């Protein structure tokens, strides 16, 4: 793996071109695809060639910029600001649950409306406004991800000290929340990166240290298996992948100090990302997140020692927080096609270890009824901390306040 394969988004400022890493081909093939239009971005986001709430917002903003640049180069003069606004509205419908894309598009629309009339023609001035916004969005996201990592580390260290915990600990995470889902470093996986760098046994000055992470396979799209393991392997962070339905067994086994693949470090933190965090703290994330929060809550109700208890953390930038939506009940949950659950797609692995052509293999009875929501909502009551670039938010009197 080369380092640049962890760069999900490549935007050339001088030539105004956008390329994205096709995440449907990972981990066996690293190929970039060129995005030339809003329609290209819509299809890439919808098909999940690019995914992760921060990443799709950045790709969306850059795509609007590139689309406008190519339109101006074509010499056409018919497109109005109103036409552009309509195209932006269309782009938002590619992934309705992820608030980052909607937020970025709404901010772009607000900028356009504040600077131009809807009847104005799209000009270089319009393009420059789009260019500046998208570049700033990308740079801000990267900077904020490192802050999220530091704030997550702070919460983890303070928690372990308060619990008087000593020895090694492990972390569970779901889906992919790293460099491939953001501008770089990541949110939940960014916290894990920071913890690995500063709290591993070889560098920790504390009586506790990070030892292992357990990424979930993340059915049905397998982002954990394909993408998170790809990043962890590259970063040389100790990990063992498990299926989504192994978490309770994992926590129970490690709590009994039984060794799993060379580690017996108990699970102390479950860290997830979010596609939307609403005003009360309810957090929409990859399907299976709610069950992780419920599992942590169950074990905490059975553990008698404070030092055994597990903290459930959500790591997300401020751009993911939706203060206009009061509770998680109001979040629109995207439903994915049935075939994503009833079949698997991937390259053929030959006996000699080489990679062959991609194939789709059925794994379920044909023609059955399927429910395939892409997200669920973890209620705020089960969340211990929501880590943003500003601070690790904890509940006061049982409630979050952002």
Curated annotation (Swiss-Prot):
The EC number(s) this enzyme carries: 5.3.1.23
UniProt keyword annotations, A-Z: Amino-acid biosynthesis, Cytoplasm, Isomerase, Methionine biosynthesis, Nucleus
Catalysed reactions listed for this entry: 5-(methylsulfanyl)-alpha-D-ribose 1-phosphate = 5-(methylsulfanyl)-D-ribulose 1-phosphate
One GO term describing the cellular component: cytoplasm
GO MF, one annotated term: S-methyl-5-thioribose-1-phosphate isomerase activity
Subcellular location(s) per record: Cytoplasm; Nucleus
Active site: residue positions: 275
Pathway listed: Amino-acid biosynthesis; L-methionine biosynthesis via salvage pathway; L-methionine from S-methyl-5-thio-alpha-D-ribose 1-phosphate: step 1/6
Gene3D superfamilies: translation initiation factor eif-2b, domain 1, Translation initiation factor eif-2b, domain 2
UniProt record, GO biological process: L-methionine salvage from methylthioadenosine
UniProt entry tagged with the keyword Amino-acid biosynthesis: yes
Record HAMAP family: Salvage_MtnA
Family classification: Belongs to the eIF-2B alpha/beta/delta subunits family. MtnA subfamily.
Protein name per Swiss-Prot or TrEMBL: Methylthioribose-1-phosphate isomerase
Species of origin: Clavispora lusitaniae (strain ATCC 42720)
Encoding gene (name): MRI1
């Amino acid at each position: 793996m080369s380092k640049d394969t962890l760069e999900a988004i490549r935007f050339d400022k001088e030539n105004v071109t956008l390329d994205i890493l096709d995440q449907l081909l990972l981990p066996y093939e690293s190929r970039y695809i060129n995005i030339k239009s809003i329609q290209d971005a819509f299809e890439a986001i919808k098909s999940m060639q690019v995914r992760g709430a921060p990443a799709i917002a950045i790709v969306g903003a850059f795509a609007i910029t590139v689309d406008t640049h190519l339109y101006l180069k074509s010499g056409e003069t018919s497109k109005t600001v109103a036409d552009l606004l309509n195209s932006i509205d269309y782009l938002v419908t590619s992934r309705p649950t992820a608030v980052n894309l909607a937020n970025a598009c709404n901010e772009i629309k607000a900028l356009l409306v504040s600077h131009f009339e809807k009847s104005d023609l799209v000009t270089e001035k319009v393009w420059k406004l789009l260019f500046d916004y998208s570049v700033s969005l990308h740079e801000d996201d990267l900077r904020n991800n490192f802050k999220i990592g530091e704030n997550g580390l702070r919460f983890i260290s303070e928690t372990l000290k308060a619990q008087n915990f000593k020895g090694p600990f492990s972390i569970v995470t779901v889906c992919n929340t790293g460099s491939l889902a953001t501008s770089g470093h990541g949110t939940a996986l960014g916290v894990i990166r920071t913890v690995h760098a500063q709290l591993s046994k070889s560098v920790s000055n504390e009586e506790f240290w990070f030892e292992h992470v357990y990424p979930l396979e993340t059915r049905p799209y397998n982002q954990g298996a394909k993408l998170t393991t790809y990043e962890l392997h590259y970063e040389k962070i100790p990990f063992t992948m498990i299926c989504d339905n192994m978490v309770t067994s994992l926590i129970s086994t490690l709590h009994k100090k039984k060794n799993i693949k060379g580690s017996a470090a108990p699970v102390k933190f479950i860290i997830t990302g979010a596609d939307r965090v609403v005003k009360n703290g309810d957090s929409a994330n990859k399907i299976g997140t709610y069950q992780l929060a419920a599992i942590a809550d169950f074990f905490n109700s059975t553990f008698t020692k404070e030092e055994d208890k597990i903290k459930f953390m959500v790591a997300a930038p401020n751009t993911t927080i939706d203060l206009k939506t009061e509770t998680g009940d109001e979040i629109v949950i995207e439903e994915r096609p049935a075939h994503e659950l009833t079949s698997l797609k991937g390259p053929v692995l030959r006996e000699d270890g080489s990679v062959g052509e991609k194939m789709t293999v059925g794994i379920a009875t044909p023609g059955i009824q399927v429910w395939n929501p892409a997200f669920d909502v973890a209620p705020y009551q089960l969340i211990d901390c929501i880590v943003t670039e500003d601070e690790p938010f904890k509940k006061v009197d049982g409630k979050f306040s952002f």
